Amino acid sequence: MRVTQGMIQQNSLRYIGSSYSKLDKLQSQISSGKKISKASDDPVVAMKSLKYNTQLSQVQQYKSNASQAFTWLENTETNITEGIDILSKVRELAVEAQNDTNGEPERQAIGVEVKQLKEQLLNIANTQVNGRYIFNGTNSDKPPVTDNGDGTYTISDTADVVVNISNNMSLKVNSDPKSAFGGTSESGQNVFEMLDSFEKALNSGSLDGMDSVLNDIDHFSDGMSAERSDLGARYNRLELVNTRLSAQEETATKVLSDNEDVELEEVITEFIAQQSVHRATLAVNAQIVQPTLIDFLK
């Protein structure tokens, strides 16, 4: 087959174009740090990246859920602990009120303090974090405990707040108000009603049922302590899961990086080598495509 000058020029241009393409690809890898810039560059790498990115996003979502769960559990435990401390103070006042040396003024003063502690406990029960009532489950836009104004208090029935923290694993992160504040006494009162009755007894001077009051205080304190222990167990479980999620995130990030990221030093070295090849290609092709008719006749 006769090789013409036109064929030589076409081949030369093709080699130069191929060299430019290699340089462009290497330059893109250096600037982005990635092996590919579009799926067509390497479909296998692209498919693996899609898979690994999905896995990493899922793990990161679980970690975000776990972070929210930690916040909810920590706030709940803190407030229940404050509630237990309040009842401990109320118990001290109940014991003090039984002292025969206390007259009516002293017991009424104790009654004022009990009222303040009751109001403080009510504020704890209706605690809001980021605009949400943490003790009212999924109905977090409304306060869980309502003062009816007649010595009775309504405590909401709530649905649990459940958070997905891993594949096929979820965790209850809230405490419903009835469990969080000790349930009800043998007489059917909740803790707020018991405190209200105790306050009224102090103001009226009727202290015949003080043993019952002390028993009720212990009952509510025990119930709240049990709920706090349950919160602690859930918190420990969450910590274990979160540790595993952190390890999974680290692994997924590494696998994704190994699949997508270039070894920058290697690519730079290859780029420099390709530049040398490109310059040589240009020089050689310049000699090939330049000859004129006179050059051939020499």
From Swiss-Prot:
Q: Which InterPro entries match?
A: Flagell_FlgL, Flagellin, Flagellin_C, Flagellin_N
Q: Output the Gene Ontology cellular-component terms.
A: bacterial-type flagellum hook; extracellular region
Swiss-Prot/TrEMBL GO biological process terms: bacterial-type flagellum-dependent cell motility
What is the top-level taxon of the source organism? Bacteria
Please give the family membership noted in the entry. Belongs to the bacterial flagellin family.
Query: What keyword terms does UniProt attach to this protein?
Result: Bacterial flagellum, Secreted
What are the protein's GO molecular function terms?
A: structural molecule activity
Protein name in the entry: Flagellar hook-associated protein 3
Q: Where in the cell is it found?
A: Secreted; Bacterial flagellum
Supply the gene name: flgL
